[in-house]
Structures are given as structure tokens and as C-alpha cells.
């Protein structure tokens, strides 16, 4: 049995279902029943159930694509701010170019990087990696910070909108799971995308006409 509606707001400990769903983020299983571990919106997706946090806090998971800022360095790693209460670090063993003789020629303090979460340990340290295709340093573009429900709205629930935005504005957009979005293109097109994202931030994502409004903004610019 399912005890909540899709996109219903739930509290920590709320009983979600006793059906055999796969556990997603923000959930846990006890005595054959699935509960919410956080305050957020419930999403039923295929065979999985998850809860997206309402508060603006990012909780890392293995494989997440994130945008981070280099805040410090040591002999063996860099400290990375991933817009979370969790501490991110990038070991030198996780570089995309292990043959570079001077690591400071690769990464510097304040650089913005596109990374993936390689591991989250028992004391909430987040090991990051650049050893996947497409990862690395941002040398241009604009990065903005948004709320977690907005990330879910654009990257999972309505991913087609992000594709549509890129195609019609001739821009590149990368959505980090940690609440940061990178946009690259002409200034006026970047401003259009920011306007669309601000609308999503202000409006209730559950509103039925929001998607149509966004599509209209994309197809019929002022």
C-alpha cells in the first residue's frame, strides 16, 4: 500500500509505503516499510521512491555530478567547496592528467570544477574525482546557485526542458546535483536562461501551467 501522494510534502519518519520499491535518496527501510528520512517532496519514479529536500541543503551520493570551488590544497589533495555541509576533497590520484609535473599548473585556488562524487565515508567526507569524460575546469561561462527542488525539476523530472533551453538559446547548460548550474553562451541568452530559472525558483513547481509558461518563454523571447 502507498500511504502518500506523489509530490506530497512529508516529514522525517513519515510512512511512505510498504510496497517493494527501490530506496532512493531521503528514504530508509524498516521492518519491510519505507519511511522518509528528511522533510521534503515525495517522488515515485518507476520502481523507485525518493524524497527531495525542501531545505537548501545538498546531501552527496555516489556518482552525483557536482560543481565545486577549490578552497585549499595540500601535498596529496585539494579541498573543494561543494555547496554542502559535507567536506569535499579531490585527491591527486583522481586527476584527469596524472603526468602533469606541477599540480598547480592544473588546479588553482578559486578554480571552478565539474566533478563526480566517488565516495562518501562514515564521517561525511566526500571524495571527488575528475577521472571521467567531460569533467574538468571551467574556463568560461556563468555559474548560479539555485534551490534543490529546482535542480530536481530541471535535471530529473523535466530534463527535456533543459535540452530545449540549450537548443533554442544556443547555450551549454550543466546542472550540478549540489545546487549549482553552469551556463555558457551569448550574454543575452544567458540572461534569458537566468530569467527562466528565477521563474522556477519563485513559482510552485507543482503548478500545472509552469511548464507551458517556460516553453512559451523559450520559444517566444521578448
Curated annotation (Swiss-Prot):
The lineage of its organism: Archaea, Methanobacteriati, Methanobacteriota, Methanomada group, Methanobacteria. The keyword RNA-binding applies. This is Exosome complex component Rrp4. Component of the archaeal exosome complex. Forms a trimer of Rrp4 and/or Csl4 subunits. The trimer associates with a hexameric ring-like arrangement composed of 3 Rrp41-Rrp42 heterodimers. The keyword RNA-binding applies. Belongs to the RRP4 family. Non-catalytic component of the exosome, which is a complex involved in RNA degradation. Increases the RNA binding and the efficiency of RNA degradation. Confers strong poly(A) specificity to the exosome. Keywords: Cytoplasm, Exosome, RNA-binding. One of its GO terms (cellular component) is cytoplasm. HAMAP family: Exosome_Rrp4 (MF_00623). It comes from Methanosphaera stadtmanae (strain ATCC 43021 / DSM 3091 / JCM 11832 / MCB-3).
Amino acid at each position: 500500500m502507498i500511504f502518500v501522494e506523489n509530490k506530497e510534502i512529508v516529514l522525517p519518519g513519515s510512512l511512505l509505503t510498504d510496497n517493494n520499491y527501490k530506496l532512493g535518496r531521503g528514504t530508509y527501510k524498516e521492518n519491510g516499510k519505507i519511511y522518509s528520512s528528511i522533510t521534503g517532496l515525495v517522488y515515485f519514479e518507476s520502481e523507485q521512491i525518493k524524497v527531495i529536500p525542501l531545505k537548501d541543503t545538498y546531501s552527496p551520493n555516489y556518482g552525483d555530478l557536482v560543481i565545486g570551488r577549490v578552497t585549499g590544497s595540500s601535498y596529496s589533495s585539494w579541498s573543494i567547496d561543494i555547496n554542502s555541509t559535507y567536506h569535499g576533497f579531490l585527491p591527486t590520484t583522481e586527476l584527469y592528467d596524472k603526468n602533469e609535473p606541477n599540480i598547480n599548473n592544473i588546479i588553482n585556488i578559486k578554480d571552478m570544477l565539474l566533478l563526480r562524487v566517488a565516495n562518501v565515508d562514515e564521517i561525511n567526507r566526500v571524495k571527488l574525482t575528475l577521472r571521467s569524460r567531460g569533467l574538468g575546469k571551467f574556463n568560461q561561462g556563468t555559474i548560479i546557485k539555485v534551490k534543490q527542488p529546482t535542480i530536481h525539476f530541471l535535471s530529473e523530472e523535466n530534463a527535456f526542458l533543459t535540452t530545449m533551453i540549450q537548443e533554442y538559446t544556443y547555450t551549454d547548460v550543466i546542472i550540478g546535483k549540489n545546487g549549482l548550474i553552469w551556463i555558457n553562451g551569448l550574454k543575452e541568452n544567458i540572461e534569458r536562461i537566468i530569467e527562466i530559472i528565477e521563474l522556477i525558483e519563485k513559482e510552485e513547481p507543482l503548478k500545472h501551467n509552469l511548464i507551458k509558461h517556460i516553453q512559451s518563454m523559450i520559444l517566444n523571447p521578448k
